[in-house]
Amino acid sequence: MSNNPEMNYTSKELDAMSNEELARLGTELDGVTVAYRKERFPVEGDPASKRASRTVGIWFGIGIVSALAFLAVYLFMPWEYKGLGEDGLWIYTFYTPLLGLTSGLAILSLGIGVIFYIKKIIPSEISVQRRHDGPSEEIDRRTITALLNDSWETSTLGRRKVLKSMLGIGGVLAGLTIIAPLGGMVKNPWKKGELGIQGDGTLWTSGWTLHEKGVKLYLGRDTGVTAEKHETSVGTHYSTQGVSRLIRMRPEDLAAAAMETVFPLPAEFVNDGDKYDASADVYEEQMHSIHGPRNAVMLIRLRNSDANKVIEREGQEDFHYGDYYAYSKICTHIGCPTSLYEAQTNRILCPCHQSQFDALHYGKPVFGPAARALPQLPITVDEEGYLVAAGNFIEPVGPAFWERRS
């Protein structure tokens, strides 16, 4: 019961009250007085009411259509990357803009429809609330339901079946435009794709895994070149035709005590030396190799005096070629690039978290948070004198993960 003597009602008295009286009582108990309320359309069937309903319905309809369009674009429109000159490029260029346009319009039109509904249909009302302290009254349990019912009745949404349905559908679809993109974040990390220059999409593979499929992989040096500029009668344009981002390496290309970052270069994508073809365009495929998350390898040429001190890992005694050793450039801590090499100490350093690996001791960690040695890539020289991979890594590259046994 209420602690306010003036608001101390029995259950029988509350049962005798109408919904309107209970609603008014509820506002009074909350210290709120409805000073003014005016129906927008007091006369049933008022043409102005129908015009207002149509306006709101149009905006809800736009929201529904836009939300459906968003789902159609997201689910069915081609989203795979298309490069310059490839079929379907013009469709691909519209994919992201259409997602933004349809999702934005769906949410915006739903909001505009709600605003119009409030401004044009819900009764005009002025309420005054008084400040008061203390806990809520027990009687509030009875009046809150009446207040909600009163709000529903005064909104007139209950008898506007079409608008009610459109608002519900629009709200659900607008919500889907927010929830649906989250599906793109759900990925099975062990779902294998087609094995390519970047692996098959799982943590077990890299571009070097192609060696297991019989693909000859050269150790490719990054030249850093980009598309070449051409001047023609129609203007200036850039082309990658005849441009080689990765080229093959010979042992003599690397000085003693030096390090070079190399990437897998399949024989079919070679375009240098005696295999150079000015009309070939392998630039994009070579860039895919450079961008492979587990492809980067450090090729180190030790001094002859240091090479005699090397401690080989059991089972990997023949992974090197003379003074040349190839270690994964992906730190075994959390996958940062181990991009520094101290020629005097023969240590490989990860600048991110200061892990250090001994190049003379099969890439074993000697300092920092890394707990495992850098995987070593077996290398050799082919009949033409170029450095090639003699096999794949015998362990996963990069940091630890749950399924890894070591």
Swiss-Prot record:
**Membrane-spanning residues:** 56-76, 98-118, 166-186
Cofactor details (free text): Binds 1 [2Fe-2S] cluster per subunit.
Q: Where in the cell is it found?
A: Cell membrane
* Any matching Pfam family: Rieske
UniProt keyword annotations, A-Z: 2Fe-2S, Cell membrane, Disulfide bond, Electron transport, Iron, Iron-sulfur, Membrane, Metal-binding, Oxidoreductase, Respiratory chain, Transmembrane, Transmembrane helix, Transport
Q: Which cofactor does it need?
A: [2Fe-2S] cluster
What GO molecular functions are on record for this protein? 2 iron, 2 sulfur cluster binding; metal ion binding; monooxygenase activity; oxidoreductase activity, acting on paired donors, with incorporation or reduction of molecular oxygen
Which residues are involved in binding [2Fe-2S] cluster? Answer: 331, 333, 350, 353
Q: Which Gene3D superfamilies match?
A: Rieske [2Fe-2S] iron-sulphur domain
Query: Which Cys pairs are S-S linked?
Result: 336-352
Which InterPro entries would you find in this protein's record?
A: QcrA_N, Rieske_2Fe-2S, Rieske_2Fe-2S_sf, Rieske_Fe-S_prot
Its domain of life reads Bacteria
* Similarity comment: Belongs to the Rieske iron-sulfur protein family.
Q: What does this protein do?
A: Iron-sulfur subunit of the cytochrome bc1 complex, an essential component of the respiratory electron transport chain required for ATP synthesis. The bc1 complex catalyzes the oxidation of menaquinol and the reduction of cytochrome c in the respiratory chain. The bc1 complex operates through a Q-cycle mechanism that couples electron transfer to generation of the proton gradient that drives ATP synthesis.
Q: Which PANTHER family match?
A: CYTOCHROME B-C1 COMPLEX SUBUNIT RIESKE, MITOCHONDRIAL
Query: What is the name listed in the Swiss-Prot or TrEMBL entry for this protein?
Result: Cytochrome bc1 complex Rieske iron-sulfur subunit
Q: Which organism is it from?
A: Corynebacterium diphtheriae (strain ATCC 700971 / NCTC 13129 / Biotype gravis)
Instruction: Read off the lineage from the record.
Output: Bacteria, Bacillati, Actinomycetota, Actinomycetes, Mycobacteriales
